[in-house]
Amino acid sequence: MRHSKFLVVSFLALMTLSFTACSSSDDDGGKGKIERPKYLSDAARYKITTQGSTWKSLELTEDGRYFIVYDGSVSGSSSQDNDDVIVSGSYEKKGNRYVLNTVGELTITANNNSYELLLTNKGKSLKFSAQKSGTLPSNKVNDELCRTWVFSKCYIVVKYDGKKVYNASSTSANELYDGFRSAINTPEYKDKLKLSQDKEEDIDGLRLLRTVTFTHAGSYYVTTTDGREDLMNYWKWINANELIIGFSENEDQTSVHDQAALKFDNGQLIMVDSQSKGREEVTITMEFQPVHTDR
């Protein structure tokens, strides 16, 4: 898949850590404390079972966002290359209905071991049968992670023989990429900084990164400034006590292709990638802020 290849390299690769680089959870005992999501009890992912539907799944998240995944291989999808298409936005609950911004009103009805989803918009309606995915329990660490995070800042340090070749932080991925690329391609270092050159494409990819959403259903979504690169994959805890998670393209998660260590600090989600090769060391620290429901 085009978008999976791009973002697994440019986002998840930056999250894959030397596990000594990051400590366990620390919410500073109140300052910057991460708020409890508004819709914890409503959050769920529904896998569409209606035969021939272009919809693969619909998920309502803990903090008031929805994600609809369309099957790009089914005729009628807007995908140009059979990639799944993801539509996302905010929702509100009104009585027993969910108002999905720009999409319509959703009613969910339990029917024995399955669910009926009815979506109405401007007098038109769509009806789906669905199965509900399993969910992780509500606890401190799951509830802190499972929400939408927006990329806010990145800090990059490149060292060679202990000397800093590049040392900068910015809220602008464009600014960081341009400075990083210029620093590692000087005549003095361009033939020495092999690790940095390997990471150049990853850092370039940060320019498209917008938000990351983790859910109790074990799915995660990445949205970008170019919606065609949005993706949905799966996550699970490798070690919840140490805040180490694994990522997979398969829902059963029998194989995990990447791992990441996380840290909560002053209301932020922080990910640090510190790698060395020979005399070269590259450290990338990424900061994410929680997105408010109305974003």
Model regions and ranges:
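Bacterial N-terminal signal peptides that target proteins for export
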Residues: M1-V9
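Lipid interaction determinants
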Residues: S25-I86, K94-Y234, I238-R295
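Outer/extracellular conduits and scaffolds centered on Gram-negative outer-membrane beta-barrels
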Residues: S10-M15
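Cys/His-rich metal-coordination motifs, chiefly Zn-binding "fingers/knuckles"
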Residues: R2, S23-S24
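C-terminal motif of bacterial Sec signal peptides marking the signal peptidase cleavage site
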Residues: L17-A21
